[in-house]
């Protein structure tokens, strides 16, 4: 369960290391984000002089605001078959406005729930889908 002010790891090679959730997308009353949900994040830690570029062609720096999709959560998620899935960390992948990942690699496993939410590009880049 991800909510405002939650600090998350970034699971791609976009150059961003840590982000903070600013807003959970999906309606005014939506408080928590889970696997496959889109959130708005603020960059808290980025590799210096490296990483994604914003619309003006400048390097992304701390405090930059980006869109991201949740790929791993510590809180367990119940699947329709009755099993539960949980991970060791809370992680996101940075995406653009069309839902495509900005990085070219995904580190660590991602949840199968991303397939249901139509994030097939992230699924194909991930080394393991659980």
From Swiss-Prot:
Keyword Ribonucleoprotein (UniProt): yes
Domain of life: Bacteria
An annotated GO BP: translation
Keyword field: Ribonucleoprotein, Ribosomal protein, RNA-binding, rRNA-binding
Subunit and partners: Part of the 50S ribosomal subunit. Forms a cluster with proteins L3 and L19. In the 70S ribosome, L14 and L19 interact and together make contacts with the 16S rRNA in bridges B5 and B8.
GO (cellular component) term, any one: cytosolic large ribosomal subunit
Protein's organism: Leptospira biflexa serovar Patoc (strain Patoc 1 / ATCC 23582 / Paris)
Protein name in the entry: Large ribosomal subunit protein uL14
GO molecular function terms attached to this record: large ribosomal subunit rRNA binding; structural constituent of ribosome
Any Pfam family the entry gives: Ribosomal_L14
Role noted for this protein: Binds to 23S rRNA. Forms part of two intersubunit bridges in the 70S ribosome.
Family the entry assigns: Belongs to the universal ribosomal protein uL14 family.
């Amino acid at each position: 369960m991800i909510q405002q002010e939650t600090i998350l790891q970034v699971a791609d090679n976009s150059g961003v290391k840590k982000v903070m959730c600013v807003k959970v997308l999906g309606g005014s009353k939506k408080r928590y984000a889970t696997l496959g949900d889109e959130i708005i994040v603020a960059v808290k830690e980025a590799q210096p002089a490296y990483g994604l570029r914003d619309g003006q062609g400048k390097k992304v720096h701390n405090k930059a605001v980006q869109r991201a999709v949740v790929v791993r959560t510590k809180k367990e998620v119940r699947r329709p078959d009755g099993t539960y899935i949980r991970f060791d960390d809370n992680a996101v992948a940075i995406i653009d406005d069309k839902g495509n990942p900005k990085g070219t690699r995904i580190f660590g496993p991602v949840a199968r729930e991303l397939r249901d939410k139509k994030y097939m590009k992230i699924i194909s880049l991930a080394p393991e889908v659980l």
